Amino acid sequence: MVRVKRGNVAAKRRKKILKLAKGFKGAHSRLFRTANGQVMKALVYSYVGRKRRKRDFKRLWICRVNAASRSHGLNYSKLRNLMKQASLNINLKMLAQLVLFDKKAFSQIIDLVNK
């Protein structure tokens, strides 16, 4: 039976991990074992971060809409309920954009909903 040397495959695998660890401090970017652990941890953090980003933006949009609607005498919950009753379907992101960039349009929405 011919002996299989894995030098090529192992070197490629290590090189790939060390390339991913570029920018890490100290041994975390130079030594394979520590770099491997840190890369795995970083990949987990990035996966979790992508899920978390969605939650964070939703919270931010709700805060913005709530603050703007309170200045008109409504809170966020009542505003969304009144919008639903008026069959006004504007998603949360667009509503937050209106609050930031077009306060006049947001005021018109409030007036339309309050009728």
From Swiss-Prot:
Q: Which Gene3D superfamilies match?
A: 6.10.160.10, Ribosomal protein L20
PROSITE patterns, alphabetically? RIBOSOMAL_L20
Q: Which CDD domains match?
A: Ribosomal_L20
Report keywords, A-Z.
Answer: Chloroplast, Plastid, Ribonucleoprotein, Ribosomal protein, RNA-binding, rRNA-binding
Q: Pfam families given for it?
A: Ribosomal_L20 (PF00453)
Example GO CC term: the record gives: chloroplast
Q: Where in the cell is it found?
A: Plastid, Chloroplast
Q: Which domain of life is it from?
A: Eukaryota
Main location per the UniProt record:
plastid
GO biological process per UniProt: ribosomal large subunit assembly; translation
Q: Which GO terms describe its molecular function?
A: rRNA binding; structural constituent of ribosome
HAMAP family linked: Ribosomal_bL20 (MF_00382)
Any idea what job this protein has?
Binds directly to 23S ribosomal RNA and is necessary for the in vitro assembly process of the 50S ribosomal subunit. It is not involved in the protein synthesizing functions of that subunit.
Which NCBIfam families does the record match to this protein? rplT_bact (TIGR01032)
Q: What is this protein called?
A: Large ribosomal subunit protein bL20c
Q: Which organism is it from?
A: Emiliania huxleyi
